[in-house]
């Protein structure tokens, strides 16, 4: 007797390579986490499985990786001086930036905080700060 083959499909959300060409579109909507890294960076390699694990667990979030060697101008625009650096957006608004390899629990806590935010208040404050910076 032959049994039907069953295949298990795992819903994996791969990380996205972020470049200066796709950056603005990538951070525009929803929750986005950006990992600034370099291949020569030991702590970056230690953080990579944490970041990848979170991307597999939270398929509704965009997880982007910015290679600081290939995207030096993009890294400079964020003022990245130490890697890895994790940057978080929600609805196109940058809300968090921290250098260092975070443990999985800290990444999960950050995601929970990002999900819980009242974006109406934050959007209003962000627009106010942008207007002040532009001298309006």
Q: Where in the sequence are the language-model features?
A:
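N-terminal "domain-start" segment that seeds a small globular fold
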Residues: 6-25, 60-62
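Short active-site neighborhood of thiol/selenol oxidoreductases, capturing the structured segment around
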Residues: 28-39
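Conserved helix-turn-beta segment immediately C-terminal to the redox Cys motif
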Residues: 31-33, 46-66, 72
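Structural micro-motif
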Residues: 32, 72, 78-87
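Short cysteine clusters
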Residues: 41-44
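Non-catalytic, surface beta->alpha helical segment in thiol-disulfide oxidoreductase systems
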Residues: 87-121
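CheY-like receiver
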Residues: 119-136
